[in-house]
């Protein structure tokens, strides 16, 4: 049996291993090549991983060393690193303390990303016209992990902004070798079911390896074939995937994605409907008010109140025309007499007598024709005038009253046209053709039919 004093504590063992790491000359300065992974720029010290096809090691680069790096680190970038291996006692993990770092070409994943991006761009898939999102969506599909924070953020935002929206979750694997096929399967399922106004596809943040399913060509082409607009929410705001380029809209966060598919909140929609209703009611009231004013003006117009004045001007025009016609005839007769006198002064004897007789006959004929023409023209004008007067007479309110009709006014002379204009115990006046009759309202009854 081993004595208890011979057992080491975890701390003691870790400290022993750290001393071994620090004392080993082969670990004091190592030269490595690998791809950067799990990198996110921070203020101060930088933490990331170096990996190849079979292994991965954590790396730390202190502020002073990192300040000498003249380029930006990127996910998947292949680099050459000089540093020392050390053990971190609190976690018992060994890691590389990077002292110098420089690029070594392009990382495999990043290179694959750039190649696919270039290929799809050449096909014009990034330049497609964005499909518009509806202002008032009814159904939206969400493709993401059922256990992540993405779906919770989306549900919370939709419940706050537009609670009548129906969200349908299509759970998918969003990380690992099976993720791309799972995403494509769910997208095809949404397309088959149909009836969705938009699709949100996304996941939370992670390394380029974690997000890689959203850079797969099969996923990109499945998104292109979707009949409805697609909103991408993959990773953090600084992450960019092929899915972001293909989607109609890109959202930096799941909350932003939910806001994009609900452009108008339910409260705003209800307020807009209320405002439109008020405007419609006001417009109807204004139209009815203007129509009532026009009717009142028409009822008070000269045509209805003094119809005789309508054809006064026509009587005057006929009289003026008759006077001008008579004056014209007299002028022509005087001119003919003058010509006759002039001709007589130039003739003598028998020739004068013969010429005079002929002229008298001509004058008599002209007088007769003028008289006939004047009578015919006057007759035609009188007939036209009589026809116009008859037409106006039929339109005269007095004529209508003469056929047994009547109209009713109140004490102020306002015409009462509808049952709603009458009040019980109201004094009214009934106007007939030759006068008016006073009356008193005792009952009101609406006719049906």
UniProtKB/Swiss-Prot annotation:
Keywords: Cytoplasm, Exonuclease, Hydrolase, Nuclease. It comes from the Bacteria. Its EC number is 3.1.11.6. InterPro entries: Exonuc_VII_L, Exonuc_VII_lsu_C, OB-fold_nuc-bd_dom. Bidirectionally degrades single-stranded DNA into large acid-insoluble oligonucleotides, which are then degraded further into small acid-soluble oligonucleotides. Heterooligomer composed of large and small subunits. This is Exodeoxyribonuclease 7 large subunit. It comes from Lacticaseibacillus casei (strain BL23) (Lactobacillus casei). The gene is xseA.
């Amino acid at each position: 049996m081993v004595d208890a004093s011979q057992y080491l504590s975890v701390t003691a063992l870790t400290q022993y291993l750290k001393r071994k790491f620090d004392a080993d000359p082969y670990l004091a300065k190592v030269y490595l090549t690998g791809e950067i992974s799990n990198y996110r720029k921070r203020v101060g010290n930088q933490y990331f991983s170096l990996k190849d096809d079979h292994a991965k090691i954590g790396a730390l680069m202190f502020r002073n060393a990192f300040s000498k790096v003249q380029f930006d680190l990127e996910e998947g970038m292949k680099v050459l690193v000089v540093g020392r291996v050390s053990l971190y006692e609190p976690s018992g993990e060994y890691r590389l303390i990077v002292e110098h770092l420089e690029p070594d070409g392009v990382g495999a994943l990043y290179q694959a990303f750039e190649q696919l991006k270039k290929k799809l761009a050449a096909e014009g898939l990034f330049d497609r016209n964005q499909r518009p999102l509806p202002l008032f969506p009814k159904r939206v599909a969400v493709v993401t992990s059922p256990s992540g924070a993405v779906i919770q953020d989306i549900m919370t935002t939709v419940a706050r902004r537009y609670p009548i929206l129906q969200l349908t979750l299509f759970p998918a694997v969003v990380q690992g070798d099976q993720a791309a096929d799972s995403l494509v399967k769910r997208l095809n399922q949404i397309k088959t079911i149909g009836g969705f106004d938009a699709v949100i596809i996304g996941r939370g943040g992670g390394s380029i390896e974690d997000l890689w399913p959203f850079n797969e060509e099969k996923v990109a082409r499945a998104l292109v074939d979707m009949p409805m607009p697609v909103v991408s929410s993959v990773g953090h705001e600084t992450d960019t995937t092929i899915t972001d380029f293909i989607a109609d809209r890109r959202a930096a966060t799941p909350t932003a994605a939910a806001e994009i598919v609900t452009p108008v909140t339910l409260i705003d929609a209800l307020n807009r409907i209320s405002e439109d209703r008020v405007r419609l009611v006001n417009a109807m009231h204004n139209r009815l008010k203007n129509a009532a004013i026009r009717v009142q003006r028409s009822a008070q117009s000269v045509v209805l109140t003094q119809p005789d004045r309508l054809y006064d001007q026509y009587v005057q025009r006929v009289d003026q025309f008759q006077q001008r016609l008579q004056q014209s005839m007299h002028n022509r007769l005087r001119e003919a007499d003058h010509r006759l006198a002039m001709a007589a002064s130039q003739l003598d004897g028998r020739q004068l007598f013969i010429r005079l007789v002929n002229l008298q006959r001509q004058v008599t004929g002209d007088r007769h024709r003028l008289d006939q023409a004047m009578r015919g023209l006057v007759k035609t004008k009188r007939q036209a005038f009589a026809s116009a007067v008859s037409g106006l007479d039929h339109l005269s309110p007095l004529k209508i009253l003469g056929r047994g009709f009547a109209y009713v006014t109140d004490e102020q002379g306002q015409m009462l046209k509808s049952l709603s204009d009458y009040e019980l115990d109201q004094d009214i006046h009934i106007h007939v053709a030759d006068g008016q009759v006073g009356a008193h309202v005792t009952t009101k009854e609406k006719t049906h039919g």
